Amino acid sequence: MITPKVLSGFKDRLPKDAIQKAQLLAKVSVVFQSFGFVPIETPHLEYAQTLLPDASSDIQKEIYRFKDHGDRDVALRFDLTVPLARFVSLHHQILGMPFKRYAIGNVFRGERAQKGRYREFTQCDFDFIGSESLVCDAEIIQVIIASLKALDLEDFCVSINHRKILNGICEYFGIAQVNEVLRIVDKLEKIGLNGVEEELKKECDLDSNTIKDLLEMVQIKQNDLSHAEFFEKIAYLKDYNENLKKGIQDLERLYQLLGDLQISQNLYKIDFSIARGLGYYTGIVYETTLNDMKSLGSVCSGGRYDHLTKNFSKENLQGVGASIGIDRLIVALSEMQLLDERSTQAKVLIACMHEEYFSYANRLAESLRQSGIFSEVYPEAQKIKKPFSYANHKGHEFVAVIGEEEFKSETLSLKNMHSGMQLNCLSFLKALEIIGENDEDL
């Protein structure tokens, strides 16, 4: 006999969990659509050569790569952005530019499994392709904020940086291996200052003084300073080199655009330590954390990549986008008790006291569904205790009971499972009125 078990880093999703996830995905999808983003789908499995060029060395170690039955070198996608690059290169002539897309799907990374981090997880990506305008960057941040608010989250912060600022800092210190240094700096929250120092010494052969000065500069944060105060504080950096100048100027323009949108300034701050480990980012980058659950890591991250299609096409298409980590958000929302705890999406359970009443019960259920009330019929004629127990376990809000009197008069008795109140022999319209008084969760 086979012992049923699940691989580490993977998980089954029980009905309650699957319902919660579906509800969250539906909410963020509405936000994406409200900004004009359209859905696309790409395969879970790609040619390995499609995925590998833009993966950092750390990500390459985590990629699930193997030979398929045709002896082709293939891999499971580790994000949705690299497949987007392949997709846009293949279809750009019929898509029209600029192109705004969102994609929701599972991705795979063989990283160490821990709280809120899985080896298979769902990403919700939204991207603006084919424009260099910082208006696009501002809109992506606007969508991040609108999406989290749609999930009833208010206490969070989008930490913003620019890869040119990081490139400029490396240039200022004469560091040649920029991508490797930034890959390590990106681990600051994960392995701490001492861990980053050790890796920079070991892997980049930097001396202690350079590391000290480098880390001091990349830890510059806006914190409680106003936008104007912060930009005044870092203005001197624009004289160091063109990369720093361009990066800071772009952030100043971005902040002007975000200010015009009247977004609360508490929701976004500049943080020079935000690097994003993926090598394809070239411009503004950002990570979003929940202020009371920072140990969970980023729940939404992204940035600008101005060489999106360089590996697939001579025609270069730039883009900017972000990805919402829905699985991490589920962990957070669960701890905040902001999730629906029911194991059913049906609001009403219909219970019959005798086999011959099922024809009426099924007609009643269909009438409720046509009125927008999700309903199910308990499939066995039982003593009423068993259907009530079932409804309590699943989370039905109402139980409609069909006994002899209800069957003969074509009425129903209705019990509110939350309050315990029961009303007998109601007409369909009266029952519908009562059930519909609290239908916002349908």
UniProtKB/Swiss-Prot annotation:
Catalytic activity field: tRNA(His) + L-histidine + ATP = L-histidyl-tRNA(His) + AMP + diphosphate + H(+)
A Gene Ontology BP annotation from the UniProt entry: histidyl-tRNA aminoacylation
Predominant localisation class: cytoplasm
Cellular localisation: Cytoplasm
Family: Belongs to the class-II aminoacyl-tRNA synthetase family.
EC number from the UniProt entry: 6.1.1.21
Keywords, comma-separated and alphabetical: Aminoacyl-tRNA synthetase, ATP-binding, Cytoplasm, Ligase, Nucleotide-binding, Protein biosynthesis
Entries under Pfam families matching the protein: HGTP_anticodon, tRNA-synt_His
Keyword Cytoplasm (UniProt): yes
GO cellular component, one term: cytoplasm
PROSITE patterns, alphabetized: AA_TRNA_LIGASE_II
Name of the molecule in the record: Histidine--tRNA ligase
MF term (GO), any: histidine-tRNA ligase activity
Cross-referenced PANTHER family: HISTIDINE--TRNA LIGASE (PTHR11476:SF7), HISTIDYL-TRNA SYNTHETASE (PTHR11476)
